[in-house]
Amino acid sequence: PDNVEYIIQVNDNESLVKNINPILPSLNELLHLEALQGLQFFIQQFPKTHTEFIISAHTIGESTKLLMSCKNEERVFTNLLKHLKIDARNFTAYSDKKIYTHGTHYKKFYFTFQNGIFSVAEDIELLKNCIDRLKSRNNLLSNEDFAEIYMMIEKNPNQNWLVVNHKGYFQQAKKIINEGYYPILSTIEKNCS
């Protein structure tokens, strides 16, 4: 979706979890990663061979919400439904796709499977936007600047990557950062352009 603030390309989930846990409280303030553990729950349900995935943060209204997507097989998705004890007939229909819900009254996650891609989000509108974007095939890779960065990421698959969309991220960051830091933030934003 267009409202992306940043993308984390995860090529080694074990390394991500190990390195991010000690600094997660600070990262929550900067990157709004509160839903990361919920997304990790879904990754842990997949066979160990499914280790690459993308987490993206999106501006939804006044807040930031996370979306996670990865390539997968339909049988793995079917097994996920069984493992989570979700009746395959219990879904919300959207644009000829099925959206399933998992969670509690405290936190819910919405997920779907389409064209070999498993996607899960903490916001149903974000997931619907993802479904629409996957159908259109018009995504960030059609942006020349991002495509160039993504080529570099693909050449270095042994590490995890954080790619910040300075146009989206800094607008959201200004809502949570002390005003005294605005000049520094503006300088960083200007240098990113």
Residues of each region from the PLM?
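A conserved glycine-rich beta-strand in the N-terminal activation segment of trypsin-fold
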Residues: 103, 107-177
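Structural boundary/hinge residues at secondary-structure and domain interfaces
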Residues: 1-101, 146-191
